[in-house]
Amino acid sequence: MNESDALARCAEITRREARNFYYGLRLLPKSKRAALYAVYAWMRVIDDIADADGVDDNERSAGLARVEARTREVIARKAADDIARGADDIARGVDAIARGAGDGEQREDAVFQGLCAVLRDYPVHGGEFLAAIEGQRMDLAPRAYADYEQTELYCDRVAATVGRICLDVWGVKADVDVDIARELSTKRGVAFQLTNILRDIREDHARGRCYLPADELAANGITVDDLLAWSDATNADARCARFMHSQCARAQRIFAESAALDAMVSPDAVATIGAMSAIYREILRKIAVDPRRALARRVRLSALEKSWIALRARLGLLGERA
């Protein structure tokens, strides 16, 4: 299979599973796009293990342990400069998933082909993948997050890790301090995940999960059940509105604090980070405008809305909106 065919299949996987990220990732040059499709496929493996229905926590834990062991092996091979795979491993590996290589071992084999190539070809920090696994482990025994510090830790592990990996693949301009760029990338990833949390309150609650800071809920005299009841009732509840607006404001503030990141990435990644961020900012904006409705029904952008954002990003027309 030639490269263009493989990339087309990889793009289909990402389009189907990563409905928001796809619109930005497809704006990248082929090599970077293929690398991040492979990264997404790996992230999808651990996410699917943690969220698998009809599977007990012991089995989920064993699945994550298996992926961790294989990931550590790949990282060790990178450190020993022993990753000897062909230049088309990313496309071939992820393409195997698109062809329906099967669940379990076959699927993971395909993903790890891609991971080997990513770690070989880009200066990606292997520890980010291990931190992402720890983030999924936090979901194995759902619990209340006592305060924002705990919520932020979860966001860092499941989302900011991805942001930092993206930065390693995108690259930064020659005059940019990489450490500062990584700090801003962390903030952007946290803002993305806070948006996900606010979007998915009802869905997470059904899974026995709540990522909202418990102390802030208590300070407003409410529980998650109160939030869900508020969304279903006809009467207004100022406490719920106040809480939701404060959560949205925090996420918007963190987006704003990371605004300088967009000008730091390599020129060929500017449109991508712009599109991805604009899509998430628009989801957050819709939640903030009507949080009660957002609690009742998951906020989504249509394919047309996301395509329009991506087009504006490609043309450099998104502006500096935070």
Regions found by a protein language model. Give the residues of each.
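Catalytic cores of Mg2+-dependent Asp-rich isoprenoid enzymes
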Residues: 1-82, 89-193, 198, 202-322
